[in-house]
Amino acid sequence: KKFINNQNFKISDFSNHSHLDYKNIDAQSTGFKNNSFDFIISSNMIHHLPYPLKFFEEMHRILKNKGKLIIFDAHCSVLLQSILILMRHEGFDFTKNVWNSKEPATDINDLWSGNSAIPYLIFNDEKKFNYYLGSKFKIKYKKLCECTLFLNSGGVTSKTFYIPMNFFF
C-alpha cells in the first residue's frame, strides 16, 4: 500500500494482519457483491487454492464488466522443484486435475499448504484453459520469471538446516 497511492486500492488475504483492508477472505468465496472491482491482483496465491476453478468463477462474479484479473505466481521449473524438495516447503503434484471442482488440488485442511504445480497446470495448456475459462477470461500476457522471485516474495518459510551467520560474528 505504501507504493500505490490510491484510496480505492485495497488489500486482502486469508489472514488477520492489521495492514489488510479485508481480513480472512477465501478467494474461492469472497462474500463481495457482484461486479465490485475493476482490477483484481492475485499475488503468489493460486498455488494455495484447493479448487482453482472455483476461484476463477468467483473472480468473474466480483469483477466488473471488462474488469481485469492479474495473476502472478511461481512457475514450477525443475530448479524450483529441486529447491522445494531441499527446503521441504509446500510441494508440487502434476497429477492433480485443477479443472475438477470436486477433487482438491491442495490440502483443504491446511490452506497454507501449496501445490506449486497449479499455475503450470492452469496456464501451460491454453487450449484447456480456453475450454474451461475462455468464455470468462483470456490470457493476454504470459511470461516466465526466475523462481527466486517467488522464494523471496515473503511467504516462504524453510525447514532446511542452516547455520545462523550472526553466530560467528
PLM features: what roles do these ranges have?
Residues P50-K54, L79:
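Short N-terminal helix/helix-N-cap motif within the alpha/beta-hydrolase-1
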Residues N44-H48:
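Short catalytic micro-motifs in class I SAM-dependent methyltransferases
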Residues L53-K68:
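A short glycine-rich, Lys/Arg-flanked "PGG" loop and its adjoining helix->strand segment in the class I
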Residues I41:
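A conserved beta-strand element that flanks and buttresses the S-adenosyl-L-methionine
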Residues L69-T106:
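Conserved class I S-adenosyl-L-methionine
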Residues K127-K136, K140-F169:
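A C-terminal cap/extension of S-adenosyl-L-methionine-dependent methyltransferases
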Residues K1-T30, K54:
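Class I SAM-dependent methyltransferase SAM/SAH-binding core
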Residues I108-K127:
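Acceptor-substrate binding/catalytic loop of class I
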